[in-house]
Amino acid sequence: MTFAFANAVWLRGTYADVHPLGFAVALGAVALAVRWALRGDARALATGTVLAGAAVAIDNTTVLILLGGVVATLARRWPVAVVARSLAIAVLVVLAAYAYLPLRSAYVTVHRADPTLALGIPPGRPFWDDHHPSTPEGFRSLVAGTEWGPGETLVVLLTPAVLRRAADRFGAEVSADEPQGLLVVALIGLGFVIAQAPLAGVGLVLAAVVPALFGAAYPAEADPERYVLALYAVIALGVAVAADRTVRAFGRQKPAVALGVVCALLAVVSVRDVVRGHELFAYRDNPEASELGARVAAQTRDGAVVVAPWDWATALAYHAYVDRALGRRIVVCALPREHLEEYAAWMREHQVTIVSEGAPDLPGYSTRKLTGGSPQVYEIVKQ
């Protein structure tokens, strides 16, 4: 409960994103690694290895979490045959997932499935063919994020500057989500785990801390809080272990009373988190994305080019290519000036519009406001 209703976790459960799915699978793999460390269950080791492959196939940033799982498995000597078989399956899962990327990219390009190709935009734009991974450079860029330097981030991960940045970025929110001394309780619980099984405990700490440090340090990350999901999970585990030890220590005579008191205290924290995050209930009925799509459909001509930055282009692309509600309109994910030189050519065959909060400044062009609301839609016209 303390994990599920933490604001940072709950918020990321309200929308579709690959990262929480990858996190859940990776956390399952780490849990099985800890089970192997504590009990020597070879089936847990094999299943966890395959799950680790699935996690990397879903989202390659899960390797930051899985590092902790690898450390936990070192508590026992690996059974060579079991590890070899499960690792082979995991590698096949990863290869199959990543082989799909260039194959699909090549198909989209050959069949001109991406509508932006008709505008003369080179392959590699979001939604249909992000980074154009059918080329080696595009594949490396998409999978490894090479244009943003993740390697440089990893090199400085444990430096004092990154530690301070992580504390500044996540400290206040974590403290708000885990009040009334729960962080201290969690540390005590993790201390018990490390005392009982050092490598398993260290692995859990690494699984929690390494992704959070990366999220704080990576310059291209727009949503660093998604990297702290494992941190919240391990905090919840620490609280659970400490609660269990408390019940065992003080409940020898009246275990039901001790259990009831501990559960009541945790329930108070969970209720507080629910009240604190009550506004998140309204997110399921948030109409902003659908209203933007409706405004674009109502006030632009079929076949229009709709240029929008990422935050609004994603909603419009879903409206256009999933809901099929925008007809032949072409959604271009770009800043208003990014294709300034191409606008004249596009305007010969299309109405060209910009989604913007306020009239965009486009040298050589004027704009005509088509809609109200937030954001607005503007038509580009020649001066």
Question: What is the role of each PLM region?
Answer:
Residues 8, 50-72, 97:
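Transmembrane helices and adjacent periplasmic/lumenal helix-loop junctions
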Residues 49-51, 78-102, 116-125, 261-265:
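Hydrophobic alpha-helical membrane-interfacial segments at the cytosolic entry of transmembrane helices
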Residues 242-245, 259-284:
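Transmembrane alpha-helical segments
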Residues 27-47, 55, 73-77:
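Membrane-interface transmembrane helices that cradle and orient dolichyl/undecaprenyl
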Residues 307-310, 322-383:
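Luminal/periplasmic acceptor-recognition loop/helix of membrane-associated glycosyltransferases
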Residues 1-23, 57-60, 212-225, 271-274:
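Aromatic- and kink-enriched transmembrane "portal" helix at the membrane-lumen/periplasm boundary
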Residues 220-250:
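Hydrophobic/aromatic-rich transmembrane helices and adjacent perimembrane loops
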Residues 174-199:
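Hydrophobic, aromatic-rich transmembrane alpha-helices
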